[in-house]
């Protein structure tokens, strides 16, 4: 009798891939974000079955909750459109959701004007 070990396949976990910053009240990515987009695209090219999730936020110190939610949705739409239109990423590989200002990923208020890009498990 021969014993054959089967390799253990570890399931990939979701991880933060990137953060894309925005100016106050803007849905247009802040200046100098091209390298961030290029890194996201490079990851997606190297991992052809990979998918990402875009979580949009707005800072809590300004605007009403509903206004901030709509702004966060516009931010994720902006990032999604750039990835699709400029870089040719398939829409089916991108999930997007606006979270608004109900959750704040960073302690520094200004940093919460952001879309966080998460690589999803394959």
Task: Give the location of each predicted region.
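Periplasmic peptidoglycan-binding/tethering modules of Gram-negative envelope proteins
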Residues: 1-51, 92, 110, 120-122
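Conserved phosphate/oxyanion-binding catalytic-loop motifs
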Residues: 54
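Periplasmic OmpA-like peptidoglycan-binding domain that tethers envelope proteins to the cell wall
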Residues: 28-34, 57-122
């Amino acid at each position: 009798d021969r014993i054959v070990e089967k390799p253990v396949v570890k399931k990939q976990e979701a991880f933060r891939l990137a953060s894309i910053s925005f100016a106050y009240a803007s849905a247009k990515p802040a200046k100098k974000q091209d390298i961030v987009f290029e890194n996201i695209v490079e990851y997606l090219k190297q991992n052809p079955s990979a998918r990402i999730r875009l979580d949009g936020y707005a800072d809590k110190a300004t605007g009403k909750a509903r206004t901030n939610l709509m702004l966060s949705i516009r931010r994720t739409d902006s990032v999604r459109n750039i990835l699709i239109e400029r870089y040719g990423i398939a829409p089916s590989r991108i999930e997007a959701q606006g979270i608004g200002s109900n959750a704040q990923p960073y302690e520094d208020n200004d940093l919460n004007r952001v879309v966080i890009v998460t690589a999803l498990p394959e």
